[in-house]
């Protein structure tokens, strides 16, 4: 319907240009949005207001001219002008109802498009250090990142999901020392415990597995513990593999899988970090000061220059990030999206500046970033801070065990990524309309229940009969529901383009509300065969869109609740 109205207004604008009412070069950028008050129609456009100045006319006068020039259409039953010049459109019932067969015909593909066909996108997300269990912040990144990948795939892009393992550096050394301390019989309360060591109960789990000589399978490698208490390298390799496996198990339970696991250590092993340093030095963008090597990132928009190589010869953490992103570019990913925590904000400018300094043909502003804010977990209104397993934070596994995968995924992705999120465990577990996951899933299950009742009553759905009488879906609640269904493809397209998965979550909440309102207002199981089947068809269309939307969120659509 929205596309139809845009086409009608474009045709009217073209006619006004031919009549000399509009300048020939006036931009016909038509915007049409659903109205908030249905007394003002189903859709509205401000085209007359945007064209009034180039036309040299009052907006309302121009609106009248545009309405007069609209081609006739069976899809529109009424057009009004409101306020200073808004044009309001009332959709004809028959036209609004055509979304029902469109949905039923398309099925699982309704809402999908090929707008990104032929384009490759790499999405890096989670990318947790293999030093402990995944925390709720990683969980939010996993939910947002995976939903974003699903959205991009739904709009035709070829998506590669990538996990970057920071398996080099001081934190890995601290992990190895912590596990070694446990292997040697120390506890976190002992004075000899490593100063920056990890203290969670999982460290003891790793140590016991190491002493038992276990073999760990993680992603691309098998590591067998040597059980030698003094072999720090062996302990390090085993601990990293063990915790990578644990993170993999958490992600599997969360319904998230990756195509590529990239190890930071491989950048050093393959000489890519040294090659990046060499290219930056040869490019003339570095200088020596106080025994360190600095990169002139201020030449590329940073607020100050950054140390690249420290006095002791070690690299700062952003240097391997530059090498890693150069590798992404060289792999042919012209579009890269990094979903990370907001604590990475300071690295965005540095990495982009480093990439520009390489003069490798990488465009400014590459890669894209989606940064999420922190998650606060509450129970009974009180913040939950600790996990028995991790010791210092709430883990993703804690949440999944508490409220299940569906609620965890939906809640973590249902708000704007740049907004702090309060995860209310009590709300996520509740079976009430206040719980958005329950509310949406219940709408799906409710349709399934109606279809079973129809079957049991000997009144199975007759699609042919339903399609002949969709025009009888003329109750205001039915029309509002059909209009909402028609907006789904646009929501998917916009959410993918804007990198905002929460738009799908909000749409599903609105759709569920419209469905429950309609269900409570009009009786489905009436004796009138024509009307009953038309309403069953509307229910089936609603069920399909809910299922499609929940799939984009990585959430199930149960048939019974």
Curated annotation (Swiss-Prot):
Its EC number is 6.1.1.19. SMART domains: Arg_tRNA_synt_N (SM01016), DALR_1 (SM00836). The keyword tRNA processing does not apply. Pfam families: Arg_tRNA_synt_N, DALR_1, tRNA-synt_1d. GO terms for cellular component: cytoplasm. A motif ('HIGH' region) lies at residues 128-138. GO terms for biological process: arginyl-tRNA aminoacylation. InterPro entries: aa-tRNA-synth_I_CS, Arg-tRNA-ligase, Arg-tRNA-synth_N, Arg-tRNA-synth_N_sf, ArgRS_core, DALR_anticod-bd, Rossmann-like_a/b/a_fold, tRNAsynth_Ia_anticodon-bd. It is found in: Cytoplasm. One of its GO terms (molecular function) is ATP binding. PROSITE patterns: AA_TRNA_LIGASE_I (PS00178). It catalyses: tRNA(Arg) + L-arginine + ATP = L-arginyl-tRNA(Arg) + AMP + diphosphate. Keywords: Aminoacyl-tRNA synthetase, ATP-binding, Cytoplasm, Ligase, Nucleotide-binding, Protein biosynthesis. The keyword Ligase applies. Its main location: cytoplasm. Monomer. Belongs to the class-I aminoacyl-tRNA synthetase family. This is Arginine--tRNA ligase.
């Amino acid at each position: 319907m929205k596309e139809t109205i845009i086409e009608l207004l474009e045709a009217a604008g073209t006619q006004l240009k031919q009549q000399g009412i509009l300048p020939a070069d006036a931009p016909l950028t038509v915007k049409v949005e659903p109205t908030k008050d249905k007394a003002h129609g189903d859709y509205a456009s401000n085209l007359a207001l945007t064209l009034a100045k180039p036309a040299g006319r009052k907006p309302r006068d121009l609106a009248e001219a545009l309405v007069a020039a609209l081609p006739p259409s069976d899809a529109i039953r009424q057009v009004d002008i409101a306020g200073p010049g808004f044009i309001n459109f009332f959709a004809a019932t028959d036209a609004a109802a055509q979304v029902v067969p469109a949905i039923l015909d398309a099925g699982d593909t309704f809402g999908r498009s090929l707008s990104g066909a032929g384009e490759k996108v790499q999405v890096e997300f989670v990318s947790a250090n293999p030093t402990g269990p995944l925390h709720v912040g990683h969980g939010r990144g996993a939910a947002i990142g995976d939903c974003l990948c699903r959205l991009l795939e739904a709009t035709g892009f070829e998506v590669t999901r990538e996990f970057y393992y920071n398996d080099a550096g001081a934190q890995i050394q601290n992990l190895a020392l912590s596990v070694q301390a446990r292997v040697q019989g120390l506890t976190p309360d002992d004075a000899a415990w490593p100063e920056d060591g990890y203290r969670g109960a999982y460290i003891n789990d790793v140590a016991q597995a190491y002493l038992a000589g276990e073999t760990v399978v993680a992603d691309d490698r098998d590591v067998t513990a040597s059980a030698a208490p003094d072999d720090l390298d062996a302990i390090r390799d085993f601990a990293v593999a063990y915790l990578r496996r644990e993170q993999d198990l958490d992600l599997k339970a969360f319904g998230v899988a990756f195509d590529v696991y990239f190890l930071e250590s491989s950048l050093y092993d393959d000489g890519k970090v040294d090659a990046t340093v060499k290219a930056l030095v040869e490019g003339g963008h570095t200088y020596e000061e106080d025994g360190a090597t600095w990169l002139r990132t201020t030449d590329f928009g940073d607020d100050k220059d950054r140390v690249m190589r420290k006095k002791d010869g070690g690299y700062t953490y952003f240097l391997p990030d530059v090498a890693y992103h150069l590798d992404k570019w060289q792999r042919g990913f012209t579009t890269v999206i990094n979903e990370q925590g907001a604590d990475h904000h300071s690295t965005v400018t540095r990495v982009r500046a480093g990439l520009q300094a390489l003069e490798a043909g990488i465009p400014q502003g590459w890669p894209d970033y989606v940064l999420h804010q922190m998650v606060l977990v509450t129970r009974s209104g009180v913040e939950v801070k600790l996990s028995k397993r991790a010791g210092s934070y709430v883990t993703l596994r804690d949440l999944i065990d508490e409220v299940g995968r569906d609620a965890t995924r939906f809640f973590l992705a249902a708000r704007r990524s740049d907004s702090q999120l309060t995860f209310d465990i009590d709300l996520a577990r509740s079976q009430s309309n206040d719980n958005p996951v329950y509310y949406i899933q219940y709408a799906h299950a409710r349709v399934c229940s109606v279809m079973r009742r129809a079957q049991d009553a000997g009144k199975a759905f007759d699609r042919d009969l339903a399609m002949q009488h969709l025009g009888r879906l003329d109750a205001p609640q039915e029309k509002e529901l059909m209009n909402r269904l028609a907006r789904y493809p646009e929501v998917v397209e916009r959410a993918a383009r804007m990198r905002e998965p929460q738009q799908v979550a909000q749409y599903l909440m609105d759709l569920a509300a419209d469905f429950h309102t309609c269900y409570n207002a009009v009786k489905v199981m009436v004796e009138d065969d024509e009307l009953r089947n038309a309403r069953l068809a509307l229910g089936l269309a609603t069920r399909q869109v809910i299922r499609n939307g929940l799939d984009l969120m990585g959430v199930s659509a149960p048939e019974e609740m």
